[in-house]
Amino acid sequence: VTCDSNPTQFNDKINRRTLIAAAAIAPALIATGVSGANAQAATGTAKVALVTGSSRGIGAAVAKRLARDGFSVTVNCVVNRDLAAAVVAEIETAGGKAVWEQADVSDPAAVRRLFDVTDRAFGGVDVVVSNAGIMRLAPFATMSDEDFDRMIAVNVKGSFNVLREAARHVRDGGRIIALSSSITQLRSPTYGPYAASKAAQEMYANVMAKELQGRMISVNAMAPGLVNTTLFTDGKTTEQIEGFAQRTPHKRLAEPSDIADVISTLCSSDGGWVNGQTIFANGGIV
């Protein structure tokens, strides 16, 4: 179906496709124990989001916010299974729909499985937020090969794995968001390799937006500033953290919910015209 097809014909074809897809996955939904409420998503009556690295921090806030926005959500973790289950429980308690899956994004097979789980649970995916990442800090002179290689494996290769599957799976009209960082502009000492791994997200988003032309999928990078998460605060004293907070015009760190609010807007119908961009949400620190 081309973009200039008759709208009625387009909708009829989409509806037929959706019904066929729903019938095809019904046995899988029963086999995996997905509730009837969750199965409703497979008929196209609900949007579906997959958020990597969403057992805590920004990812958890994004998963919960998108669930409040009406998305069925796949929560992802690497090791924090209890935290991922808790995020799902919170979403379900609030009346939302969610599943969780353990997957290391640096493993292409694990990422494919993550998308397969989402397809089986909800019948497809409309939004992918590539959030999973790690941070290793050291001056160039003392950065170890092991720390550098692991950070590149997760942040650069891992995000590539996620975005590759997103390009294959996200339905037309969807959203793809890769998490960058405002450290690409701050360029602070000890952050060099980490900043480079985050700059890659901006290139990914800009190029992918062009590659997916004609499908009405918007692809952007989100670059948070200083956020009150363990990723940022671990290894820092209270005085150091307060010093960073005072560098922002608002004199505070962002909370994960601040970033989730911006991502929510990008994922809404109002965010479609923002495409191929890097969105800085840093409270004005740069």
Where is each model-derived feature located?
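Alpha-helical segment proximal to the catalytic Tyr-Lys
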Residues: 168-169, 210-211, 272
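Conserved glycine-rich Rossmann-like NAD(P)H-binding loop of the short-chain dehydrogenase/reductase
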Residues: 71-86
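Substrate-binding pocket helix/loop in short-chain dehydrogenase/reductase
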Residues: 139-140, 144-149, 240, 244
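Short, small/polar-rich loop/turn modules that mediate ligand/substrate recognition or access, typified
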Residues: 213, 218, 274-276
